[in-house]
């Protein structure tokens, strides 16, 4: 199977340190602030486009059950090397066939929304996020 533009990008520009740099720290802290504003104890979180697992690992360390979905195998390898017990699967935000309907209380879809090109691709990922998120659940 041919690599997507996203996979080629992350094979060339590693994701693992981005959220640890100055601008990335601001992004991470701001995002976590808003996620925490709406999380409830025992929420099941789906982190779609999880990259190397920065959000997944942080939320898991706080006691939340988190499943990560990531497109780029290199990112998954880095993620699992750092956190071998992580619940991560290879998948595409536009077609998460491996995730059942209505399972997540919260779905995080940040990366796919700014990496996918064109409204049609973004709408596909939003529809998938809606499908896997419980009625009344939240999508970030």
Residue map of PLM features:
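Structural signature of beta-strand start/N-cap positions in the alpha/beta core
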Residues: 44, 65, 87, 103-105
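Class I SAM-dependent methyltransferase SAM/SAH-binding core
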Residues: 54-95
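Conserved beta-strand signature within the Rossmann-like core of class I S-adenosyl-L-methionine
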Residues: 136-140
